[in-house]
Amino acid sequence: MLSALAIANYRSLRQLTAPLGRLTVVTGANGSGKSSVYRAMRLLADIANGGVIRSLVREGGLSSTLWAGPERFSAAMLRGDVPVQGTTRSEPVALKLGFAGAEAEDFGYAIDIGLPPPIPSTAFSHDPQIKHEAIWSGPLLRPSTQLVDRKGAALRLRDGKGWQAVGRPIPAFASMMTEHADPRDAPEMLTLREQMRSWRFYDHFRSDADAPARQPQLGTYTPVLANDGTDLAAALQTIREIGDGEALDSAVDDAFPGAGIEIRVNGDRFETLMHQHGLLRPLTAAELSDGTLRYLLWIAALLTPRPPALLVLNEPETSLHPDLLPALGRLIAQAARQSQVIVVSTPPG
């Protein structure tokens, strides 16, 4: 489990260290940096998948993703006597991300991403470069707890005899996670990489008239709902057959008293139907309101038979009627019994 998240110089976040529990809610007004927290978590997951540099470039490169304010605030700026304005930079340009483990057997990780030195002979002179990486055990990075150290192209691994240098250099555009996750020499790196790859993110479920979740879908065992909810019907049926079918029925009834869901199977196609009190026939997914469909998608995501180590939800309350929020909260709390959960949420009003 993670005990803390650290972000420095990312978009609207100058420096943030946030404690994490089994269930953590990140909330605040618009512009307070909630979305930056979510996107920073996505970048950390991209490191384990080898895509962090590409993701940063898609966001506009370091020039667009770095802290948008001045390097330092003068006393006059803090008092409001003068407007906030840029100052002469005295520190290296660096985006820093990391997290700490909760227990001694958990691993922590940190990365420092900066600008490349002037290299006139390459067309990739604007690509961000990974400057430093570190892995340690437990909640604090100390010389006694550090297990892996990467500085520039040089990688060192710690074993029972001390620090051992790895002969092969690490490219500046690649993480040590993907370049040297050796089960013999660096088992902690391999373990941490697979943990980070298992992190699961849900950001936005489509609920428009053409949303994939409204259409009949190919049916196959689906223990993990797709990010866009394409396989809703198959995911719900998988929960019923190999997951907690009673929890599924209870979650539907908690939000819609007297209602139930059914998965209609027509050949290789699955379709979601919802029975509601007072109606003579079930409603298909195409007929459901946006809020009802989104709630069913959250049920499928949160009651997964294959819970991840970390589940990150971005504004799950979007498009839900206020009456559904208590049931959603209970559903999220139930998911937190199986996974560590981080919820990014906008406060009501």
Residues covered by each model-derived region:
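Switch/communication elements of ASCE P-loop NTPase nucleotide-binding domains
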Residues: 1-50, 258-261, 266-349
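Conserved N-terminal strand/loop that marks the beginning of ABC ATPase nucleotide-binding domains
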Residues: 1-9, 93-97, 200
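Short, solvent-exposed secondary-structure boundary motifs
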Residues: 7-8, 101-103, 249-255
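Conserved P-loop NTP-binding catalytic core
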Residues: 39-118
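Electropositive, glycine-dotted interaction segments
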Residues: 94-242, 246
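Active-site phosphate/pyrophosphate- and oxyanion-stabilizing loops and adjacent acidic/basic residues
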Residues: 190, 250, 330
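Extended helical coiled-coil dimerization/tether regions that scaffold
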Residues: 220-285
